[in-house]
Regions:
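Short, composition-biased local secondary-structure segments
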Residues: 23-25, 68-71
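Left-handed beta-helix
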Residues: 35, 40-41, 46, 56-57, ...
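Terminal amphipathic alpha-helical/low-complexity segments used for targeting or macromolecular assembly
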Residues: 1-30, 36, 103
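Short glycine/threonine/proline-enriched tight-turn/helix- or strand-capping micro-motif at secondary-structure
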Residues: 18-22, 42, 47-48
Length: 117
């Protein structure tokens, strides 16, 4: 019985926190986030240019992932677009100006730059 109660509590807390997180990013900050997308409470989405973040449907942004839309040195803001059905792994960093195509996986600890030469 205790295992059942613990499991129910985990499921309820997870679903409620995910929905509140999405409400916060969509309504309060005005980010474009598709249906079915899950954003971990430990993920960090840049709020200096919130309209510049677009995340497609059915994507997952995991704990510790960082999505940045501004360049502190040059004081520029550039949008970030993450497509449908994408996965951004633990502690991955997505820098300003990046477009991630549909069905992409960004591995844990990755640094994604707009231009790789």
């Amino acid at each position: 019985m205790a295992r059942l109660i613990a499991r129910l509590r985990t499921l309820l807390f997870t679903n409620v926190s995910v929905r509140l997180n999405l409400f916060y990013y969509r309504r309060v900050w005005g980010m474009q986030i598709g249906e079915g997308t899950r954003i971990s409470r430990g993920a960090k989405l840049d709020r200096t240019f919130p309209g510049g973040i677009t995340i497609g449907r059915d994507s997952a942004i995991t704990h510790g992932a960082i999505i940045v839309t501004h360049d502190f040195v040059n004081r520029e803001h550039r949008p970030v677009k993450i497509g449908d059905c994408c996965f951004v792994g633990y502690n991955a960093v997505v820098l300003p100006g990046v477009t991630v195509g549909d069905h992409s996986i960004i591995a844990a600890g990755s640094l994604v730059r707009p231009r790789i030469t």
